[in-house]
Amino acid sequence: MIDDLRIKNLRSILDSGKIELKPIMILLGSNSSGKSTFLRSFPLFTQSVDKKLRGPISWFDTSYVDYGDFKTAKNRYAEDEEGISFEYSYYNLRFMDTRRFYVRKGNYVYPTELKKGTFSFELK
C-alpha cells in the first residue's frame, strides 16, 4: 500500500513535496495546477507493474494513461539537466495470515510482516 508520494517536474507539477495519502482525499486547486496529473500518476504506475519491463516505468504504453512525449510532459520551469522524478513510500504486506482469530467483536485477519520502504526513480 502506498503511504506517500512525491512528483517532480511532471507537467504543471514542479515539486509536489511529500503528499501523505489517506483513505479519503480532496484535491483543490485552480485550473492547470496539477490535480489531474497527480491522479493520473497512479494509473501510470499500474500500467508499469502490470507488465515485465526493462525500466522502472512504462511511459510509452497507453493502456491506462498517456502523458505524451517526454518533452511535452516535463515541467517547463524545470532545469534542462533535471528529469521527471517519482518517489513512493510504501508498506509492504508480504505475508497475510489468513487464520481466523475469534475475539469478542468478530474475526480478524492480521499482517504478520509489515515493512516500510521507498521506491524512487527519475526519467531523463
Feature roles, as predicted:
Residues M1-K124:
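P-loop NTPase switch/coupling surface
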